[in-house]
Amino acid sequence: LSGMDENAASLARKWGLGLELTDFCEARKLEEPAAMEAARARCSGIGSLWLHAPFAELSPCAIDPRVREVVMLRFRQTVQAALALGIRRIVVHSGYIPLVYFPEWFTARSVEFWREFLRDAPDGLCLALENVMEPEPDMLVQIAAGVDDPRFGLCLDVGHANTRVSETPPLDWIAPMAPWLRHVHLHNNDGDWDLHDALGQGMIPMPDILAALAEQCPAADYTIENQNCELSLRWLCARGYLEEP
C-alpha cells in the first residue's frame, strides 16, 4: 500500500500487506532527522517494504551537468535513507519530460547515469524505474537493457500508462517491460488525468491487467497507489484476489 494514503501503514498491518514509503518524495526531507524518525515509526511491524524516491526536478537525463550532480546526490541520499530503514527496494521516476528531452538523449544519458550510480551501490539493492510521462514503454526498456544490471529493473505504473501523455494502452505496456519488471503501481483513472482512483473506478480493465501481469510477470509485486486504499482492497476481496483479515 502506498504511503500517499495517510492510513496505509495501519491498513498494511491490519491486512498483513506491505508498505511503499513516501516520506521522502520531497527531497529536502532526506536531510531532516525528524523525517527519518517518522519513517522508522511508520515502517514498524511491516515486513515487506519499498521506498519511493524523491522526484520533483530530479531528471537523471538532465542537460545541465550541475543539475545532474544534484540528482546523483539526492538518489545516493535516498539509498542511504532506505538502508538505514532496512529497505533495499526503491522506486525511482524516469525524469522524462515530453518536448524537453529528445528520446535518443533521454535513453542514452539515462543509461550513462544509472551505470555510474550503480558502481557504488550495494549488492542486493533493487531499483525500479517508473514510467510517468512516457508515451510508450520502449524508452524504459532500452534503458533497462542498456544498464544491464541485476540491481536495476522497471516499475510499471498502470495509471500513468492510461493518462493523456500515453499513446499506448496499459495492457500493451506489460509484454515489453516483462523481462525487467520488478514492481507495479496500481490505480485507475478516466484516461485523461492522473487521478489515482480506486481500482474499480475508471476505464482501465483492471482484471485483464492483473491476469496479464500474473501470467507474464509472476515475480513482480504491487503497490496500490490510492489516497484511500481501502476501497481498492474491498474491490480485490470482492473478486477473490484477497481475503479480508
Q: Where in the sequence are the language-model features?
A:
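Hydrophobic faces of well-ordered beta-strands that scaffold small-molecule active sites
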Residues: 1, 17-21, 49-53, 90-92, ...
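Acidic-and-aromatic substrate-binding clefts and catalytic sites of carbohydrate-active enzymes
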Residues: 1-9, 22-37, 59-62, 98-102, ...
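N-terminal pre-domain/capping segments
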Residues: 1-77, 243-245
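Histidine-acidic metal/acid-base catalytic patches
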Residues: 7-13, 88, 137-152, 156, ...
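Helix C-cap/helix->beta junction micro-motif
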Residues: 15, 44-47, 85, 121-123, ...
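Charged helix-capping and loop-helix junction motifs
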Residues: 33-38, 67-76, 104-114, 166-175, ...
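Alpha-helix-loop-beta-strand connector modules within alpha/beta enzyme cores
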Residues: 39-56, 110-124, 206-213
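Active-site acidic/histidine proton-transfer and metal-coordination neighborhood
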Residues: 61-153
